[in-house]
């Protein structure tokens, strides 16, 4: 079915970071993972030829399908203009203001994985079932101290619970990507720790992970162009040695939040 759609519209893929999921088994598993109900409005980013779109529409109240590629937008209109519960939005998902939605289910364009994930996490929704490159997914869920533990891990944990549901081999796509993929379940929730200022915390995490191999004392001093803390050396000297003598990659999100809160309080005096 999926291959026949690609052939019918002479779609090759490869532009706009396109890798079409053609394995029906994985498509069906994604739909099951989304736990759809007839009351759900679903956002799909990078709808492609609509192979996932049509499966979502069978179970959901409405599917909002966002697609950038004009050729694929034409395919979606041709296939679904007469389907009442599918709305096609032509545009860049990073720039489009999303309508209200309950769940997001997508085979995401890999080149915008970070930006689109953090854009999504600013919206209110119940559940996300999202396809990423496997290495990216591993970074989202890594425990502290592992090589995959990163700014992405901490930022994701601040906004949501994330877990890898399944690994998807590159052969399940056409054209096949260079690496395997993974389906990630995202469940937004209130942060499990308190921060004084969210914008400062996120900037602090970005700063210290830009020098993840350095001790926190040095990474803070070296990235003050981002943090903009007056009298930075004096401020850092007031931080507990237990924190500043460790690397960012060895601190839990809660510990990083504690340091960010102390810095914010000290800079605000």
Curated annotation (Swiss-Prot):
The keyword S-adenosyl-L-methionine applies. S-adenosyl-L-methionine binds at residues 19, 21, 46, 67, 92, 107. It is found in: Cytoplasm. Gene3D superfamilies: Ribosomal RNA adenine dimethylase-like, domain 2, Vaccinia Virus protein VP39. SUPFAM superfamilies: S-adenosyl-L-methionine-dependent methyltransferases. Keywords: Cytoplasm, Methyltransferase, RNA-binding, rRNA processing, S-adenosyl-L-methionine, Transferase. SMART domains: rADc. Its EC number is 2.1.1.-. InterPro entries: KsgA/Erm, rRNA_Ade_diMease-like_C, rRNA_Ade_Mease_Trfase_CS, rRNA_Ade_methylase_Trfase_N, rRNA_adenine_dimethylase, SAM-dependent_MTases_sf. GO terms for molecular function: RNA binding; rRNA (adenine-N6,N6-)-dimethyltransferase activity. GO terms for biological process: rRNA methylation. One of its GO terms (cellular component) is cytoplasm. It holds the Pfam family RrnaAD. PANTHER family: DIMETHYLADENOSINE TRANSFERASE, DIMETHYLADENOSINE TRANSFERASE-RELATED. Specifically dimethylates two adjacent adenosines in the loop of a conserved hairpin near the 3'-end of 16S rRNA in the 30S particle. May play a critical role in biogenesis of 30S subunits. HAMAP family: 16SrRNA_methyltr_A. Belongs to the class I-like SAM-binding methyltransferase superfamily. rRNA adenine N(6)-methyltransferase family. RsmA subfamily. This is Probable ribosomal RNA small subunit methyltransferase A. It comes from Methanosarcina acetivorans (strain ATCC 35395 / DSM 2834 / JCM 12185 / C2A).
């Amino acid at each position: 079915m999926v291959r026949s759609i690609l052939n019918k519209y002479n779609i090759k893929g490869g532009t706009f970071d396109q890798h079409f999921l053609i394995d029906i088994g994985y498509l069906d598993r994604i739909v099951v993972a989304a736990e759809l109900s007839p009351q759900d409005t679903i956002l799909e980013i990078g709808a492609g030829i609509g192979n996932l779109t049509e499966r979502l529409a069978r179970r959901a109240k409405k599917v909002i399908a966002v697609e950038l590629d004009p050729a694929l937008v034409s395919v979606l209109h041709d296939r679904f203009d007469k389907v009442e519960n599918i709305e096609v939005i032509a545009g860049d998902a990073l720039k489009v203001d999303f309508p209200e939605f309950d769940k997001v289910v997508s085979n995401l364009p890999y080149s915008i994985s970070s930006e689109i994930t953090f854009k999504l996490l600013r919206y209110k929704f119940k559940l996300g079932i999202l396809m990423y490159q496997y290495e990216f997914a591993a970074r989202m869920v890594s425990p502290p101290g592992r090589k995959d533990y990163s700014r992405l891990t901490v930022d994701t944990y601040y906004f949501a619970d994330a877990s890898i549901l399944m690994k998807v081999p590159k052969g399940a796509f056409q054209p096949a990507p260079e690496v395997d993929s993974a389906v990630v379940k995202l469940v937004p929730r209130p942060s499990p720790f308190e921060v004084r200022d969210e914008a400062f915390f996120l900037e602090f995490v970005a700063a210290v992970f830009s020098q993840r191999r350095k001790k926190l004392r040095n990474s803070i001093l070296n990235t003050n162009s981002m943090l903009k803390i007056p009298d930075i050396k004096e401020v850092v000297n007031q931080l507990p040695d237990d924190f500043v003598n460790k690397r960012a990659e060895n601190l839990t999100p809660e510990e990083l939040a504690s340091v960010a809160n102390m810095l914010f309080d000290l800079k605000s005096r």
